[in-house]
Amino acid sequence: MRHPASILHDKSSRTCYLCVTLHDNWNEHRILDEHHIFGGPNRKNSEEYGLKVYLCHDHHIYGPEAVHNNTRIRHELQRTAQRLFEKQHSHKEFMEIFGRNYLDSVEIGENSEKENEPV
């Protein structure tokens, strides 16, 4: 089975998602790590729905801003992924698939209003 592309980040750009997001640094990297935003039991779901980004080593595992070392950055990435997922799917569907909410109540309300709009 072919895995879908990331809905957050274009791998062919050869940029690190966090270098761009945090520092507006668009330098290309020879080596990038694929990071699944929701790991553990949701790693397969992250892959299936394209919830992954490409990171340099410093932003993946080694530096102080590394997603595996920095809870604040990891949670912001999870919130961003949930918001993008819910642009294509419902909040209810996110909860059924991933089993946890990462957004605050205002953001959830905005997304559920979209679900109730007439087609």
Where do the model's predicted regions map?
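Short, charged surface segments at domain edges that flank catalytic/cofactor-binding sites
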Residues: M1-T21, K44-G50
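A broad, low-specificity signal marking well-ordered, structured residues that form hydrophobic/aromatic
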Residues: L32, V53-Y54
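Short recognition patches in nucleic-acid-associated and regulatory proteins
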Residues: D24-R43
